[in-house]
């Protein structure tokens, strides 16, 4: 952690049973931070750490305590899942009149490991809760208001064996079972990669990172594939609800070439479906909202990936 003359907020981000609290406790011991935990506050206020019926009131109180501690000059760790970009942005906006450094730590633990960790706990949540979190993970990025973002990997989870091109080749025969996706999953992703490589249309410093994102932008699809629509009706075609979130999370565990940021790749994948939505709905308001949030450069990068995604169908 970098030193700062101002108080520091560290926001933990991660699935349940990913080891967030262990990271937070170790950091607090080493650096004299005060931990504010959503789980501990649930137990304090409602007598049940699993109580989810008072979340609105709980987070109002939690945020109040964090802001008070920061105003008093204390370094603070915000220990909760914090998976929603919208909610992270809203909270960081609450701090705009408090002069503090804002940091984020992503507890990057593979989904299957989270399930194993959860099963071995005395106090555990249902597996479907962790699955729901997995399918709603928004990658934290600097446009949200953070000064620094780091990734803490579960031991052995980032061992250099998972390469983007290898993944795409492994899925060259994976049928997407959807008329909007006539190509197999792997071929589509490889086509997006080579479309960017062959066209060289963009004078963009991050084009190498975008190409890596193109190779695995749909890597969350196999996990999310379902033959039920959003009304839970059985259909003849496959749907992939939440695949961008699963893909963004899983992309953190790939190994990239020199100079490629896994965080940037993940952020691109996390947001790659948004242009499809605002183009489909002709929603200029949505486009302007994200352009204001992201800034020109990140918007440009997302749109480059989007153009490649469309061209590769």
Language model: regions and residue ranges:
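Phosphate-binding P-loop
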Residues: 1-6, 69
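Divalent metal-dependent catalytic cores for phosphoryl transfer on phosphate-bearing substrates
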Residues: 197, 201-312
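Short hydrophobic/aromatic beta-strand immediately N-terminal to the Walker A/P-loop
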Residues: 9-11
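Conserved GTP-binding G-domain of TRAFAC-class P-loop NTPases and closely related GTPase folds
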Residues: 13, 18, 26, 112-164
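Conserved phosphate-donor/acceptor-positioning beta-strand/loop module used by diverse small-molecule
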Residues: 98-114
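Conserved substrate/cofactor phosphate-moiety recognition/catalytic segment
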Residues: 22-74
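Acidic, metal-coordinating catalytic cores used for nucleic-acid/nucleotide bond scission
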Residues: 79-91
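Acidic/His-rich, divalent-metal-binding segments that scaffold phosphate/diphosphate chemistry
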Residues: 153-235
């Amino acid at each position: 952690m970098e030193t700062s003359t101002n108080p520091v907020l560290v926001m933990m981000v991660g699935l349940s049973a990913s080891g967030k609290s262990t990271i937070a406790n170790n950091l607090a011991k080493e650096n004299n931070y005060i931990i504010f935990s959503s789980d501990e506050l649930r137990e304090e206020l409602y007598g049940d750490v699993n109580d989810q019926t008072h979340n609105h009131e709980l987070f109002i109180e939690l945020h109040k305590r964090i802001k008070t501690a920061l105003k008093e000059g204390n370094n603070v760790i915000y220990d909760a899942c914090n998976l929603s970009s919208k909610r992270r942005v809203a909270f960081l906006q609450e701090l705009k009149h408090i002069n503090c450094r804002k940091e984020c730590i992503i507890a990057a633990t593979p989904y299957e490991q989270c399930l194993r960790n959860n099963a071995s706990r005395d106090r555990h949540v249902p597996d479907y809760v962790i699955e729901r979190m997995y399918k709603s993970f928004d990658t934290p990025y600097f446009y949200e208001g953070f000064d620094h973002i780091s990734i803490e990997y579960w031991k052995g989870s980032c061992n250099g064996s998972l390469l983007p091109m290898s993944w795409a080749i492994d899925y060259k025969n994976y049928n997407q079972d959807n008329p909007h996706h006539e190509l197999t999953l792997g071929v589509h992703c490889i086509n997006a990669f080579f479309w960017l490589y062959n066209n060289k249309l963009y004078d963009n410093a991050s084009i190498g990172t975008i190409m890596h994102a193109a190779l695995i932008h749909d890597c969350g699809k196999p996990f999310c594939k379902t033959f039920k629509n959003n009304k839970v009706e059985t259909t003849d075609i496959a749907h992939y609800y939440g695949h961008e979130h699963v893909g963004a999370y899983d992309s953190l565990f790939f190994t990239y070439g020199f100079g490629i940021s896994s965080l940037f790749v993940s952020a691109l994948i996390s947001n790659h479906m948004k242009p499809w939505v605002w183009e489909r709905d002709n929603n200029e308001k949505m486009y302007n909202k994200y352009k204001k949030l992201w800034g020109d450069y990140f918007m440009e990068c997302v749109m480059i990936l989007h153009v490649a995604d469309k061209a590769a169908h």
